[in-house]
Amino acid sequence: MAMTSTMQLLVLSFLVIASLFLGATVAPPASLISTPDQALKDKADLIVAKDGSGNFTTVNEAVAAAPENGVKPFVIYIKEGLYKEVIRIGKKKTNLTLVGDGRDLTVLSGDLNGVDGIKTFDSATLAVDESGFMAQDLCIRNTAGPEKRQAVALRISTDMTIIYRCRIDAYQDTLYAYSGRQFYRDCYITGTVDFIFGRAAAVFQYCQIEARKPGIGQTNILTAQSREEDTATSGFSFQKCNISASSDLTPIKGTVKTFLGRPWRAFSRVVFMESFIDDVIDRAGWTP
């Protein structure tokens, strides 16, 4: 039952992306996203728990134990807790699913950053290079802070990815949608400078996108998409999302410039549709 719902989500992601980027006319029902949460946890292949009640106490141990080149979804259930780890999911760990107890309860946390000499690509708290990845009910964050510049929370560098009901928190360069087809549903994403960036074909539905208080002299920019060729079928699409200011930015939002995006490359493509956009966004919309 849980595996069927996971595959339904994969199908839905392809339908939506095909509709928005490849010209197909598709209107999939929202009921496709109906994961039976407890069933998914009950059928987990491995359990991670800080208190020792699972198979492992760290996420990295569970990822290492997952099979390589799997053709069926392999589920790792991560129980409530704070996991201070830098997690790397390699190309051979295909069809891996990470599911937590909630985006405010199961937290994956790191603090790698550019000021300390880490390249942006390598700074992610969670980096995924395998296809067929899914994350649900997790918080993924980078706590480096605005003064540390580039500090990625989540990097996705592969195809067929679904991020569902997750919180993705950082400041500059929060979410690196590096490549491939990616689908984000019911997520909460926060940041400051270029905090959703990359060259992926990414769809965001029913997501909360929240600009935070940036570092001194910085301008908030929600997106920096890097489509490099006019024939490339990539871009970012935001549908039925809510764009607003965080609690620390709200009192000063009149003094901080916040834009929907900037063209990172010549053929950058970003669309906001059927979404609420708060007055935190500059009237110009996009960077000059």
UniProtKB/Swiss-Prot annotation:
The pathway it acts in is: Glycan metabolism; pectin degradation; 2-dehydro-3-deoxy-D-gluconate from pectin: step 1/5
| Annotated Pfam families | Pectinesterase
| Glycan attachment residues as annotated in the record | 55, 95, 242
Q: Give the Gene Ontology MF terms in alphabetical order.
A: pectinesterase activity
**Signal peptide (UniProt feature, chain positions):** 1-27
| UniProt site positions, description: Transition state stabilizer | 172
Which amino acid positions bind substrate, per UniProt?
120, 150, 262, 264
**GO BP term, pick one:** pectin catabolic process
A GO cellular component annotated for this chain's UniProt record is: extracellular region
> Recorded E.C. number(s)?
3.1.1.11
Subcellular localization: Secreted, Cell wall
- Sorted UniProt keywords: Aspartyl esterase, Cell wall, Cell wall biogenesis/degradation, Glycoprotein, Hydrolase, Secreted, Signal
**Which residues carry out catalysis?**
173 (proton donor), 194 (nucleophile)
Catalyzes what?
A: [(1->4)-alpha-D-galacturonosyl methyl ester](n) + n H2O = [(1->4)-alpha-D-galacturonosyl](n) + n methanol + n H(+)
Keyword Secreted attributed: yes
- The top EC class, named as a word, is hydrolase
What's this protein's family per the entry? Belongs to the pectinesterase family.
Function, as annotated, reads:
Acts in the modification of cell walls via demethylesterification of cell wall pectin.
Query: Do you know which PANTHER family this protein is assigned to?
Result: PECTINESTERASE
Identification of the protein by name: Probable pectinesterase 56
Which source organism does the UniProt entry give? Answer: Arabidopsis thaliana (Mouse-ear cress)
**In the record, what lineage is assigned to the organism producing the protein?**
Eukaryota, Viridiplantae, Streptophyta, Embryophyta, Tracheophyta
